[in-house]
A protein has these predicted regions:
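A compositional/structural signature for long, glycine/proline-rich flexible linkers
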Residues: 1-192
């Protein structure tokens, strides 16, 4: 009787720990197969048949449609370069250059992956419309209050994520270019 009780307890404990670990990984993500460049994080294999099971579970849970490897790669950032969470009440500057790509988009999402509502109805920028300097670099202000130039309104939400999608790019495909790719810096410059 005691052996049966211990066996059942061990099975229940193993099930709870296994399901808990799976839930944590599917909801909070894992660093398995990630590519990190500064504050930007990508999972280049999510659009392939070689996707890891944790990323597959996360994709199934979120309903995300990942970019295929032949099409490009998506980078996301939830913190600035100093690892501070991106706060919609603060002024954040995204500046620099992007890796070589035929086309890219930079979009603002809330923590649940939805576009952030704002009065301007501007949700992002593309490589075609962003204003650049003579050297090809850009400076984008992400803030709740209006700013001159490239401004992306946050609507004053507390936390948000930035998604940089690069189309037709060698980043994420060619192993030599991955960690050396130039990515825009993300800097929090002021909070009210």
């Amino acid at each position: 009787m005691r052996l049966i009780f211990i066996t059942l307890l061990a099975l229940i404990l193993a099930t709870v720990v296994g399901l808990g670990a799976t839930w944590m990984t599917a909801t909070r993500g894992t660093d398995l197969g990630t590519l990190r460049i500064g504050a930007w994080i990508a999972r280049p294999k999510t659009g392939t048949a070689d996707v890891d099971p944790y990323s597959r579970a996360s994709i199934a849970r979120s309903g995300e449609l990942p970019i295929g490897t032949g099409d490009g790669v998506a980078f996301s950032a939830t913190t600035d370069d100093r690892k501070r969470p991106l706060d919609g009440r603060c002024d954040v500057v995204v500046s620099g250059v992007t890796p070589a790509a035929r086309f890219w988009t930079l979009t603002l999402y809330d923590t649940k992956g939805r576009l952030v509502a704002n009065s301007l109805q501007r949700y992002g920028f593309t490589s075609q419309e962003i204003i650049r300097g003579a050297d090809g670099a850009f400076e984008l202000r992400v803030a709740s209050r209006s700013r001159a130039g490239n401004w992306l309104p946050t609507g004053g939400i507390e936390r948000y994520a930035l998604m940089l999608q690069l189309y037709d790019t060698p980043v994420g495909v060619a192993t030599r270019t991955q960690r050396d790719a130039p990515m825009p810096s993300i800097t929090t410059v002021g909070c009210p």
